[in-house]
Amino acid sequence: MHNMSDIIEQYIKKLFEESNEDVVEIQRANIAQRFDCVPSQLNYVIKTRFTNEHGYEIESKRGGGGYIRITKIENKDATGYINHLLQIIGPSISQQQAYYILDGLLDKGLISEREARMIQVIVDRETLKMDVVARDIIRANILKRLLPIINFY
């Protein structure tokens, strides 16, 4: 059985499919009511599943007529998506951000489940046992070296 976050994520992805557009606009209160959950649950899903690393941009307007606009960053090919990821990595990256990137690569069919798991082990904090700053820098360097290879094959 899926948890509420998975259900909300699938619903939003279905909205993209049905609209055939790269932009979906939702209202926090309506979604919360539809799924009988608190608005913070929706915020969690947006913050963790529709990130820049996953290939989305978020615009949010709070208040009475507030909305959340989710825009797919459209990269028609693998090269465009990988170049986008290389731009957002920066000099360092957290483990969670790295996992988001791997999720995005997996969603787009650029890596297999097995490859994603192997890369997760490589960039995991248990593998990179050192101070946080150095670990995040090394993790970024690993991903910057891997991404062009993923694009090549």
UniProtKB/Swiss-Prot annotation:
Keywords: DNA-binding, Repressor, Stress response, Transcription, Transcription regulation. GO terms for molecular function: DNA binding. Signal peptide: none annotated. Disulfide bonds: none annotated. One of its GO terms (biological process) is regulation of DNA-templated transcription. Negative regulator of clpC, clpB and clpP transcription by binding directly and specifically to their promoter region. Belongs to the CtsR family. This is Transcriptional regulator CtsR. It comes from Staphylococcus haemolyticus (strain JCSC1435). The lineage of its organism: Bacteria, Bacillati, Bacillota, Bacilli, Bacillales. The gene is ctsR.
